[in-house]
Amino acid sequence: MDPKHCEPSVATGPYRAPWWLPGGHLQTIYARGLARSYAVSYRRERWDTPDHDFIDLDWVDHASNGGRLIVLFHGLEGYSQSHYARSLMAKATEFGWRGVVPHFRGCSGEANRLLRSYHSGDSQEIDWILRRIKTKNPHSDIYAVGISIGGNMLLKWLGEQGASAARIVERAVAVSTPLDLVAAATELDFGIKRILYASYFLRTLRPRALAKVVAHDLAIDPRAIRASITFRQFDDLFTAPVHGFQNAADYWTRCSSKPWLDKIGVPTLVLNAQNDPFLPTSALPTADEVSSAVTLEFPRCGGHVGFVSGKFPGRLDCLPQRILRFFTMQLKSSNKTRVSS
């Protein structure tokens, strides 16, 4: 890996994308195709939830240092085989750490039992998962990572818990987080981004919603769900009412993690590329909007959970290396912001 193209710690230079992979769209889309480069062997475990549902967790157990455990919360429609999960778990294994990817409800390949699914602000689910992991691993140091909406849930939970989160997690990293859900959804619902991204996610979200409409006899018009082509339409029809929100705007406003950043009490890295197609730079927080425990890092490029590095065809080592370095380093200063020009 070319060190000029990857930032291994806060104190050194920012991430730079390879010359052969320009632009946020290419950096986002291309990274998905590199998942097969990382071989990971998981052990699946099923947990029953307090509300009589279930979630599946995929564990990486073969580690020399069982005292450190990374918990990775995946992004929208993600799972343990997503490119960022495989690359991070492979790198964690190299470091001798254990890892686990809890699947949000319905994301492990099997539909969950209840009407409810998962949503961008489901910090209660994060709370239950992390507390149970800590209870089952009382002698392990827990490090949490959230990707995209998994990062939004994690940051919201960290803010809600404040300093008490330190009883459960040592440190946290949120990557490519849609910190302002209103801004993110608005960004993705128009133009080329609607075609590239909203359509991609809705391709799987719509069938899942339709299955729940039938299974639970919901008073929702299936034709309207099939016809939804934006996040606003889909969240207005399904996500918001199913999870107790008035509409999409109410859901996005109440679930955004950005207002919680100034309440976080454990060392947390917020890493967002400035060319992330999912969030405009105007929605990124400033240093005075976050607590002293939060480090903001906004490299000029990287796309949405891209951060490819090296010569063609590239590698995904940069992001997991950055995450693990943050987890193992001593912060030299508080509330540090790094923005590349």
What is each model feature region?
Residues 2-7, 135-242:
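Alpha/beta-hydrolase-fold enzymes
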Residues 24-64, 308-310, 314:
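N-terminal cap/lid segment of alpha/beta-hydrolase-fold proteins
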Residues 67-75:
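Short beta-strand element of the alpha/beta-hydrolase
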Residues 78-90, 281-283:
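The serine-hydrolase catalytic nucleophile loop
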Residues 81, 89-113:
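Conserved alpha/beta-hydrolase
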Residues 91, 107-143:
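Catalytic nucleophile-loop/oxyanion-hole region of alpha/beta-hydrolase
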Residues 264, 270-272, 276:
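Short beta-strand/loop motif that positions the catalytic acidic residue
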Residues 300-341:
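Catalytic active-site module of serine/aspartate enzymes centered on a nucleophile-bearing elbow/loop
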